[in-house]
Regions:
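Mitochondrial intermembrane space
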Residues: 1-160
Length: 160
């Protein structure tokens, strides 16, 4: 791919964003609850990436995802730190480094109970993220209709 002088690259200030500084086991341990807690931000970011077809136009949505994840893990630290630490430590020490939930059911249950009682956040049921769920975005529809085909975000109403 060639670049021209017309190409506008983001500045370092545009790219500056706090880092979600958690380990892989901690991220895996909180993944289900994080996905539900930051569902709106994740959907906005993925919709932007799909519609714009240019990651530079979605930097703010990406920052929102990072900030939401940081907020989630801070709340977990403040409310359920002991059960969460026990859970991710179990995942980290699971055999052969596979971080399987199968070996940590008791720790997982304790964390999920704490998240439900203290954070009012239930783990989504299996299949929740594969269900079709509508998202009403406040972002304007992109102006280039040749990028992704139809720009209708909602299916038309059926006359029955």
């Amino acid at each position: 791919m060639s670049f021209t002088h017309d190409l506008k690259l983001p500045t370092y200030d545009d790219l500056k964003c706090p880092v979600v500084n958690v380990s892989s086991p901690a991220l895996r341990a909180g993944s289900f609850h994080l996905a539900k807690y930051c569902d709106l931000q994740f959907k906005e970011f993925m919709l932007c990436r799909q519609e714009e077809q240019d990651p530079r136009k979605c930097l703010n949505e990406g920052k929102d995802v990072s900030l939401c994840a940081i907020d989630f893990f801070r709340k977990v630290r403040d409310t359920c730190n002991d059960t969460f630490t026990t859970f991710w430590t179990c995942l980290d020490n699971a055999r052969d480094g596979e971080m399987s939930f199968n070996y940590c059911k008791e720790e997982q249950k304790a964390f999920e109970l704490c998240a439900k009682n203290k954070m009012n956040l239930e783990r989504p049921e299996p299949g929740y993220f594969s269900m079709v769920r509508m998202h009403d975005s406040k972002r304007p529809v992109p102006s280039d209709p040749f990028r992704i085909g139809s720009l209708e975000r909602h299916p038309p109403k059926l006359d029955v």
